[in-house]
């Protein structure tokens, strides 16, 4: 769906027209083989085509420590997605579900995320597989995958806390 598409039977759009609460700085651009939403996969595959993440020059020093083989969580802005749908029918069968209960790219803050391993790094370019976004998608952030990352900073008391949260 593009932002200009009609909604499907059973779907509901918001009429919210307030101002945003926060700003986002794009740190790069993602280059993929997909130019149209109908071509783009619903989920990235580890054996999918190689895509290129271009990190803008300002942010190049922030890539220090990212090497070939690094497993990253890639955050991107799904800039061609609708942002007003509250109820969606992912199967196009009229059976609506709340936007927050599905992984649709159509959401108030269209942030996409994929876990991908760096095949190769060449300066400001990361070549990876496993993305599910359009060519030219803005890059929001890169983080090491939680499963492989051990914090470098000293532990804090909350790191060891277990049990029920206070109410």
Curated annotation (Swiss-Prot):
Belongs to the tRNA methyltransferase O family. Keywords: S-adenosyl-L-methionine. The lineage of its organism: Bacteria, Pseudomonadati, Pseudomonadota, Alphaproteobacteria, Hyphomicrobiales. Homodimer. It comes from Rhodopseudomonas palustris (strain ATCC BAA-98 / CGA009). Residues 148-167 are annotated as: Disordered. This is S-adenosyl-L-methionine-binding protein RPA0152. S-adenosyl-L-methionine binds at residues 41-43, 79-80, 103, 113, 132-137. PANTHER family: TRNA (ADENINE(37)-N6)-METHYLTRANSFERASE. It holds the Pfam family TrmO_N. Residues 24-154 form the TsaA-like domain. InterPro entries: TrmO-like_N (IPR023370), YaeB-like (IPR040372), YaeB-like_sf (IPR036413), YaeB_N_sf (IPR036414).
């Amino acid at each position: 769906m593009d932002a200009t598409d009609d909604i499907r039977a059973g779907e509901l759009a918001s009429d919210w027209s307030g101002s945003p609460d926060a700003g986002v700085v794009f740190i790069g651009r993602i280059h993929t083989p997909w130019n149209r939403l109908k071509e783009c996969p619903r989920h990235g595959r580890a054996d999918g085509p190689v895509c290129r993440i271009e990190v803008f020059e300002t942010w190049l020093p922030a890539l220090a420590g990212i090497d070939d083989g690094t497993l990253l969580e890639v955050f991107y802005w799904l800039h061609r997605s609708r942002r007003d749908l509250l109820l969606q029918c992912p199967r196009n069968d009229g059976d609506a579900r709340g936007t927050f209960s599905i992984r649709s790219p159509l959401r108030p803050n269209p942030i996409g995320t994929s876990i991908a391993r760096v095949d190769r790094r060449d300066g400001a370019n990361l070549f990876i597989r496993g993305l599910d976004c359009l060519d030219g998608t803005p890059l929001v952030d890169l983080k090491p995958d939680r499963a492989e990352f051990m914090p470098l900073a000293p532990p804090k008391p909350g790191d060891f806390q277990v049990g029920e949260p206070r109410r």
